[in-house]
């Protein structure tokens, strides 16, 4: 059905099972190299991602992007770089998520520059630095960090979306841009949050 959609063809968004590994979940936002996958498991991981992308392409004609995500095995800039270096750039693209990239220790504008040719799908997600620092001090796990607003509404955090949008436009990017906003129980109305985020995007000319 997805392959039959007219207009801009959708993507299959692939991610690992976020929030299942206790160490990764507990230390989201402060992952160290020692918490990463061993080389042998990286090989299996990358091969699995490539196999999914290849099968999807062959059977449906759709392309696949990988969504890096805090609380999973591909969180930090180094881990994203490793997966990208181990997979075919013609086969597997990157779903670049600004909030997860920042919480994972990266600079979103720098990441956009680095992977601009590999980014086929883009997630608008803001980052609250105060909540991020408190997460580190208090030792919050991934879900506690989200509940405490580490991924705030657009325009309420530190990410420079105007600069990111300008860079996307300069590069000729014409793919999807999706707002991924976490609104857990007790965090307000998802509908009102979506409305405010839409107004913010309009302020950027989108």
Where are these regions (language model features)?
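Active-site acidic/histidine proton-transfer and metal-coordination neighborhood
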Residues: 1-94
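Short, flexible loop segments at the rims of nucleotide/cofactor-binding pockets, characterized by
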Residues: 70-71, 99-101
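Histidine-acidic metal/acid-base catalytic patches
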Residues: 50-54, 77-96, 102-206
């Amino acid at each position: 059905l997805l392959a039959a959609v007219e207009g801009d063809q959708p993507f299959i968004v692939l991610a690992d099972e976020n929030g299942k590994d206790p160490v990764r979940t507990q230390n989201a936002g402060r992952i160290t190299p020692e918490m990463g996958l061993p080389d042998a498991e990286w090989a299996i991981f990358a091969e699995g991602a490539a196999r999914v992308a290849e099968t999807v392409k062959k059977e449906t004609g759709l392309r696949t992007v990988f969504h890096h995500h805090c609380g999973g095995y591909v969180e930090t800039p180094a881990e994203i770089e490793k997966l990208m270096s181990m997979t075919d750039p013609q086969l597997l693209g990157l779903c670049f998520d600004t909030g997860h990239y920042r919480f994972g220790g990266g600079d979103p504008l720098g990441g956009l520059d680095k992977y601009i040719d590999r980014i086929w799908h883009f997630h608008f997600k803001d980052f609250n630095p105060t909540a991020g620092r408190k997460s580190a001090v208090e030792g919050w796990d991934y879900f506690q960090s989200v509940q405490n607003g580490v991924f705030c509404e657009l325009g309420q955090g530190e990410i420079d979306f105007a600069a990111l949008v300008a860079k996307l436009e300069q590069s000729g990017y014409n793919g999807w841009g999706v707002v991924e906003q976490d609104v857990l129980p007790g965090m307000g109305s998802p509908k009102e949050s979506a409305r405010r985020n839409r107004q913010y995007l309009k302020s950027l000319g989108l």
